[in-house]
């Protein structure tokens, strides 16, 4: 605390006059101590700015590509995924900049309103992210386990998203309700209640001040349990055993296919040897057809194994990313509810909040850029962009660019205009005839 010196001069005379010379105006512009160390502020602000740039750029790219292609919006899964990307854009625009403001504020400033808005944004980001991830998990379970009879139709998906935004908005209002922001009484009653902001160790330990934490914690743990159960069911539906690369059933099926193919080959060879010269051609054809069928079966088996590996890998990445980003702050919120807030816990909460905001970068990578349809749309847009740049800036001296995107060899049509080349091509046909 900075106290202004007061110079008191007591003059005793006949009238006992007391003169007080206040020199408050001298120190009004003095340096006020910051609430956090400079290194702490610089490091966290740098990470938050990086999350704003990367998260905003990637999520806007995904939303623009989804809106440009109508066939992507027609899918229920893509609409639910777009809802998550819209949320990430809101977090990058509104929540992360407010966290930067909280980091750079001083102790002596009146931060009650800003702290209240910050807690509201944190509550909104936590609850809405968990609910959106929960909705995407249900959609993937619906696709993998019940592809023929889907529960999430287009109408139900729209109702689900409306309910998600209503609940998220309610979670945003909870910190304001805690401090009686909307009460009709005197407006100064709520200003002294700081919500998890580093102040002068003046924290309210009443349970009514932390209802927003009581909402965030159970929603997070419920989402984690549902994710673990749902992705386990998805892996079981795809015949993937956790901890093993391939199941025994697949190995038995492969062995049966091999034995059947070998017996068919032996039978074909025996039949060809026992038959006369007329059946030689038939035996060769059957052996060739068996070989082709074997190759197709092996190819299908490899594609299925690759798909299983990809699904298993993506499931692990989705679950581990959500746990890595949101588990620390959820555990710390539980600790604050049990022990009460302190300066150390509030500083740790800001660090863990930076980790939680990292989902704005990981969500486009996990839910959009890994989809094959989205990759095709992105490649087509990049091709058109490259072609437009080349057409706008032609190279001098009639230079030719050999690019697989612009001038693929497989699309070239070979034309023979010379009569000599035509005659050379027609010579073998005349000889065989």
From Swiss-Prot:
The keyword Nucleotide-binding does not apply. Its main location: membrane. InterPro entries: GPCR_Rhodpsn (IPR000276), GPCR_Rhodpsn_7TM (IPR017452). It holds the Pfam family 7tm_1. The chain crosses the membrane at residues 46-66, 86-106, 116-136, 157-177, 209-229, 316-336, 350-370. One of its GO terms (molecular function) is G protein-coupled receptor activity. One of its GO terms (cellular component) is plasma membrane. It comes from the Eukaryota. It is found in: Cell membrane. GO terms for biological process: cell projection organization; cellular response to hormone stimulus; G protein-coupled receptor signaling pathway. Glycans are attached at residues 16, 192. High expression in adult and fetal heart tissue. Expressed in the brain, with enrichment in the accumbens, amygdala, cerebellum, cortex, and hippocampus regions. It is a multi-pass membrane protein. Residues 67-85, 137-156, 230-315, 371-433 are cytoplasmic. Residues 1-45, 107-115, 178-208, 337-349 are extracellular. Keywords: Cell membrane, Cilium biogenesis/degradation, G-protein coupled receptor, Glycoprotein, Membrane, Receptor, Transducer, Transmembrane, Transmembrane helix. Belongs to the G-protein coupled receptor 1 family. Orphan G-protein coupled receptor. Seems to act through a G(i)/G(o) mediated pathway. May be involved in ciliogenesis. This is G-protein coupled receptor 22. It comes from Homo sapiens (Human).
